[in-house]
Amino acid sequence: MNAPLHPLKQPSMLRQLLATEAAGGVLLMFTAALAIIIANSPWASAYQHLLHLPVGPVLTDKLGPMTVHMWINDGLMAIFFLLVGLEIKRELVDGRLASWEQRRLPALPALMGMAVPALIYLAVSRGELGLAGGWAIPAATDIAFAVGALALLGKHAPLSLKVMLVSVAIIDDMGAVAIIAVFYTSSINLLALAGAAGIVAVLLAFNRLRVVALWPYLIGVAALWYVTLLSGVHATIAGVVGALLIPYSAGSGAEREASPLLKLEHGLAPWVGFLIVPAFGFANAGVSFGDLGWSDIFAPLPLAIALGLLLGKQLGVFAGVLLAVKSGLASKPRGASWLQIYGVAMLCGIGFTMSLFIGELAFPGQPEKIDAAKIGILLGSLLSAVIACVILRFAPKQAD
């Protein structure tokens, strides 16, 4: 995930961030590939047994025993979303999205890059019973994978494009969080939700009292995660909400460096990048291709997702940039050709982590649909990555 920085003033720190993202992205690629290999090997049953092994206490009667898979998706991914929330708050306060001028270029591509894939998904899956709930699966971009692929290209993409990609992905994350909270929430436990509101009030009070010690906020976020789990709202949302309530001092100097938010972000980033996200990839990417035929690949669900990622993302993001620049709303990224911008738009079609996560939420208790969704996600993401890398490798370096 993103390290604290001010990208316009400290480009060298952005390069350091991209190097970290690239390493995490490569590790994610490795664990996802490993999961696919194991799922198609004699160890497939052992892999499934491990994921569904009950571990630890029963947290809620509704969920029952917590399996390894559930701890990763509901527990560790809450920490992932906590880091996402920390990044969003920092970027909005004094980062890439601190001013309206900085928000103009990535905002429209990010929004169109979510809307167009969803519309393509709905158009392709139209009339198919039980598939409408998966409309958000191709709407997300995997920042670790995308930045990792971009970093592997070295100097074939200017820094301005890397800033644009990360900025679009941050707004994309904000949209994904909102989608999960609004559209993938089950029946609500009002008592637990009231408890969550009470914890939020306590965290707000800590802010007003200028509490700078980190541990009260960590306890509060952990409690918020548990009551959110009980409430019926997906528990990962607690990570984002908790992050937004952790204090952050804008500007520069010792006060900023001492901010609880910055301390926590620095502490979480390596764990999320090198443990949590790769673990999620390993736990969720494994799908068997043993009996896979062309009819399975071109079935409505995987086809809708693959086309949403491959076509929808590139069309939405590129059209958003083109519209923002031609209308005078924003300036074209410095030193980038339109072909390079198109390549980055194509790169946004890598929707791995968040798409897999939303797929699990869209089809709960439907393993066949989840596996079909995984096929579409893998196919769309892989094609997007390969085509984008070819475009960016051979695109002219000078601006058009």
Curated annotation (Swiss-Prot):
Topology term for the membrane: Multi-pass membrane protein
Any one GO molecular function term: sodium:proton antiporter activity
Catalysed reactions listed for this entry: Na(+)(in) + 2 H(+)(out) = Na(+)(out) + 2 H(+)(in)
Cell inner membrane listed as a keyword: yes
GO biological process, one term: regulation of pH
Family: Belongs to the NhaA Na(+)/H(+) (TC 2.A.33) antiporter family.
HAMAP family for the chain: NhaA (MF_01844)
Name of this protein: Na(+)/H(+) antiporter NhaA
Native organism: Pseudomonas entomophila (strain L48)
Gene, per the UniProt record: nhaA
